């Protein structure tokens, strides 16, 4: 199954918003490439030709944050609840596109757990099963 994604480039270390359509293996390879080089990264992913939301993942070190951008029936943004990898009162700076933003432990996940959830979304198209979403 194909996916559409935009991501941080390895060489420039900047987010490139131009979408790429590929199979999920190419997307996984790009994620692993960034992780191997310890580059902070940001992805926007969606399922092509289907009315589904877009997910984003920003990661740095061992932590990540996942957002959902829905357009139907009304444009809304959500952030996925954290997995306890960072205490609720603590915070982590994670990338949103090319800028770092501060997130509390309530919405921070372990990077590999977050990536597994993004992959699950791309396989099923469903977001409700990923966890609790908080409206922004």
Q: Which residues does each PLM region occupy?
A:
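Amphipathic, interaction-prone secondary-structure segments
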Residues: 36-74
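Acidic, proline/glycine-rich low-complexity IDRs
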Residues: 1-35, 67-136
């Amino acid at each position: 199954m194909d996916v559409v994604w935009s991501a941080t480039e390895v060489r420039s270390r900047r987010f490139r918003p131009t979408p790429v359509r590929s199979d999920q293996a190419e997307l996984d390879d790009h994620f692993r490439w960034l992780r191997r080089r310890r580059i902070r990264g940001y992805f926007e992913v969606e399922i092509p030709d289907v009315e589904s939301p877009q997910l984003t993942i920003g990661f740095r070190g061992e932590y990540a944050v996942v957002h959902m951008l829905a357009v139907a029936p009304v444009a809304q943004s959500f952030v996925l609840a954290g997995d306890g990898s960072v205490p609720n009162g603590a915070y982590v700076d994670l990338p949103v596109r090319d800028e770092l933003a501060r997130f509390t432990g309530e919405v921070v996940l372990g990077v590999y757990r977050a990536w597994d959830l993004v992959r699950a979304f791309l396989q099923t198209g469903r977001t409700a099963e990923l966890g609790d979403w908080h409206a922004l």
